[in-house]
């Protein structure tokens, strides 16, 4: 491809609204252009990369035995109402009404549609297992679209769905898809980790996320330094570092704590170690109209996913209002605690092992200091309520936990019979009786993969593509292309390289574009290999080669350049 026949849309300046590196570089490299908040046009440079990701995803899905289909992007509300997700999904679901007053949504995912297809097309266990996938645009009405393609309102996704007569068959396909995902991200050249995950609004039982490791990632992912244990922070089990509860050494005392509403104020104002404080968070209980208190250590954070999954707690999690607190307890937030609390409470495992700690007195501007379990109050229900922190013991008993940032690019789920039961998706089993189909679903954020790869592979000059993902493998840059010798040598090399199957971008911009600008553009775009053709080099029988990952160029004999490049480019 010649730049004179291509939309080369590089920009020197970084747009002011682009925060993360991938967003900045995709705009500057002419890969995408913003249409509206969370909506982007893919330009030719970016689309070449996107199509390469799609091709690898498609190859590995086909190799894993999945069948490609294509479902409508617009879905009738009836299917979502049937599954129960029309109300559950919330405002992120883009809803619309047609001219006949029928409700629809723009699909963020396709569990309902594929289940409807399966119940109409499958009737016997002999047709199982079956795994179907599509690569399609999805829609989500993000409240704050940000970070370019990382969190947009429209995105390209590969979603696959499998159907099975039993859980054992589902597990086989789930493991096969886990391997396929590992193959995909390995082929894409990404540093990634699969981690245990929560199923969220998709529902079902087991699931794994695949994260590209990057400091700009939105997710905290947790690893053991002594084993292969890995989970996202929502899922990771928090094991207390303490093994036993220390003996009490302080007397219980009621202390005036005026204008002390936060843990930080309590610690600073009274010289308390933060690990000797607790937070009392009151939420709506599962029983309608009731409240329940969740208690964690002052230096820990509530894990809302874990909390919402407790049978005593309403799901989704709803914090009690100030009015509800006053009505139920007689005190406001900042003065609450488990001692003399007129509500049921659940404490975190770490709180159970505390001694001589401080709690709100359930009286405004007062706290109890020197509180101890069993002496001052009984130990209530204990559960895992908090996020893990670095240094916690690994849940598998091997090593301690580290926390890194990750970008979620894939997620696989074992849905079980959640959708088949709700939507009556059945086949006749071996015994001739109806069987609800066990189901798996498997997603990859195809467009997000492009951004994640840039987050992981860039420098101060621009993107650093590997040979697999690069929009072009070779940048061919002639200096003084208007001269006969340079033009002739460049055109011959271009023809030879393209005939050999290489993807080449020939920068044939005229002399108004300086060599420095040409070099800077090719570095910005991230093309892995650059060949420069010049009068001086040709006079010496050489061309200049430079790898995107190396700082210094090297001279290559004109006669050897094709074999040299064949040894350099990973195809």
UniProtKB/Swiss-Prot annotation:
Secretion signal, residue range per the UniProt entry: none
HAMAP family assigned: Pro_tRNA_synth_type1 (MF_01569)
NCBIfam families for the chain: PRK09194.1 (NF006625), proS_fam_II (TIGR00409)
Domain notes: Consists of three domains: the N-terminal catalytic domain, the editing domain and the C-terminal anticodon-binding domain.
Protein family according to the UniProt entry: Belongs to the class-II aminoacyl-tRNA synthetase family. ProS type 1 subfamily.
Function text: Catalyzes the attachment of proline to tRNA(Pro) in a two-step reaction: proline is first activated by ATP to form Pro-AMP and then transferred to the acceptor end of tRNA(Pro). As ProRS can inadvertently accommodate and process non-cognate amino acids such as alanine and cysteine, to avoid such errors it has two additional distinct editing activities against alanine. One activity is designated as 'pretransfer' editing and involves the tRNA(Pro)-independent hydrolysis of activated Ala-AMP.
Name recorded for this polypeptide: Proline--tRNA ligase
Annotated source species: Pseudomonas syringae pv. syringae (strain B728a)
Lineage per the UniProt record: Bacteria, Pseudomonadati, Pseudomonadota, Gammaproteobacteria, Pseudomonadales
